[in-house]
């Protein structure tokens, strides 16, 4: 069974490309993203809605709750989950479904820095072999990186404060998770100890993309539904703009760290693996 690995930093089009290959070869996409294993963090992690699969099959390594302990799960747990998924795909694999001899039985899409490092540094020890790697990478020109950051800014803006009324948001997503921690005792008092634990789980999982700033925003008792009745509109616009800028910078810096790591890992790929670099210009 041939496996195609599509890698790249945030916002470069990995999901669109993996869906295209999935439909072309009738092959499932296995998502190598640790945070997308938490459905409660679907907006924060960029986990697409099922309506965006466009007929392709998308498999996550596992489904986990945002709760104490799950932030410390070792990388080997996810790798073992991946191997189990591949065993199942292999058992169901029918070569006659492939359009040609170069068809892939599975598409990997990644993803998380920790999982990519674990996968690519131990690539020869895996029971299944990756036959081709496509690396989608923003070109290094200053102008292109300005456009890349602007694209992330646009994505973050919609993630935090969607313009379409009724759409879910990262603000509401994080608020739902934090509310799980606000358990009430018999005296009607909030158990702040568990609340703080949930908060620390969030920070541990997605602290690199500015989640503490979102939490701080909510700690000020921000309420998306009635904020206009509490705060001056100009002040509201100011604090929203500040949050968008902060989260954009966090996502952009994380993307740069992804690029740096992948650049390093690519140099270590075995020569037997077909490799394609897609330098993209952001538009």
Curated annotation (Swiss-Prot):
Q: Which reaction does it catalyse?
A: dimethylallyl diphosphate + AMP = N(6)-(dimethylallyl)adenosine 5'-phosphate + diphosphate
Q: EC number(s) on record?
A: 2.5.1.27
InterPro entries in the cross-refs: P-loop_NTPase (IPR027417), Tzs (IPR002648)
Superkingdom of the source species: Eukaryota
Q: Name one GO biological process term.
A: sporulation resulting in formation of a cellular spore
Q: Which UniProt keywords apply?
A: Cytokinin biosynthesis, Sporulation, Transferase
List the GO molecular function terms: AMP dimethylallyltransferase activity
Outline what the protein does. Answer: Transfers dimethylallyl groups to AMP as part of the biosynthesis of cytokinin phytohormones like isopentenyl adenine or discadenine which controle spore formation and viability.
Q: What is this protein called?
A: Adenylate dimethylallyltransferase
Organism name: Dictyostelium discoideum (Social amoeba)
What are the leading ranks of the lineage? Answer: Eukaryota, Amoebozoa, Evosea, Eumycetozoa, Dictyostelia
